[in-house]
């Protein structure tokens, strides 16, 4: 599958003929080499015998080895240009962006596709205690506990079994499952992995990415 982009220089450009046959790949072209704005979107439909051609026990790239061989042998190799939603989530910023796009319905994915604005999605097995504040759009998964005074703000994603302690704030952050956000802590546009522990009055600011099992002690600023 191909998709058009404004700037193909960061991607693999794909040239096709008028019938959709792929004629050339050009990885990260220079501006003067651009002949089309269609790039490789990374989605393929392969015949079963493709896997018989993949050598065993060696490093091998389907894009760099198999696809060029199809062109050289003039085998059937067709492209479909998708003009719908597509995003490269290879950076933390784009990873955050795709969640926001889903919540804003730029991409019609469940559960937000069928929700009325402001479409906060809260699993029936989550527990939002009295005095907590939820502002949509946001996503709160099963088993989440949000304690009094805590706030889950717009574009936040809170994974399964997370605990958000009293007066903590999650604003536009993505928090994977089984993490605990301590009292008075604040997360702003950050990404946290699984099983993280954020201590009391910790501040985690925009652009921060914490891996699985990260722990920040009380009053830390990152």
Where are these regions (language model features)?
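Glycine-rich phosphate-binding loop of ATP-grasp-fold ATP-dependent ligases
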Residues: 9-13
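A short, conserved acidic/glycine-rich loop-to-beta-strand motif
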Residues: 1-4
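Extended, small-residue-rich solenoid/repeat segments and analogous flexible loops
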Residues: 72-165, 169
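Glycine/small-residue-rich pyrophosphate-binding loop that anchors the diphosphate of NDP-sugar donors
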Residues: 40-43, 58, 118, 136, ...
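Glycine-rich hexapeptide-repeat left-handed beta-helix
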Residues: 163-222
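Short, ordered coil/turn segments that flank beta-strands lining enzyme active or ligand-binding pockets
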Residues: 18, 124, 142, 160, ...
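Nucleotide phosphate-binding site architecture
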Residues: 51-52, 135, 153, 205
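Catalytic-core segments of class I nucleotidyltransferases/pyrophosphorylases
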Residues: 6-8, 18-113
């Amino acid at each position: 599958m191909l998709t058009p982009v404004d700037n193909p220089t960061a991607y693999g450009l794909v040239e096709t003929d008028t019938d959709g046959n792929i004629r050339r790949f050009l990885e990260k072209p220079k501006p003067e080499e651009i002949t089309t704005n269609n790039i490789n979107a990374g989605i393929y439909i392969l015949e079963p015998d493709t896997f018989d051609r993949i050598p065993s026990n060696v490093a091998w790239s389907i894009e760099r080895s198999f696809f060029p061989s199809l062109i050289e042998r003039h085998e059937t190799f067709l492209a479909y240009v998708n003009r719908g939603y597509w995003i490269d989530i290879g950076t933390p910023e784009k990873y955050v962006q795709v969640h926001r796009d889903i919540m804003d319905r730029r991409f019609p994915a469940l559960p937000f596709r069928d929700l009325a604005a402001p479409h906060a999605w809260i699993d029936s097995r989550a527990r939002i205690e009295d005095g907590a504040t939820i502002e949509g759009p946001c996503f709160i998964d099963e088993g989440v506990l949000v304690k009094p005074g805590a706030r889950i703000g717009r574009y936040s994603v809170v994974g399964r079994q997370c605990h958000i302690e009293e007066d903590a704030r999650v604003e536009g952050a993505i928090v994977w499952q089984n993490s605990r956000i301590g009292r008075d802590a604040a997360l702003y546009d950050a990404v946290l992995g699984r099983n993280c522990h954020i201590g009391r009055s910790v501040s985690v600011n925009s652009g921060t990415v914490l891996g699985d099992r990260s722990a920040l002690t009380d009053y830390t600023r990152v």
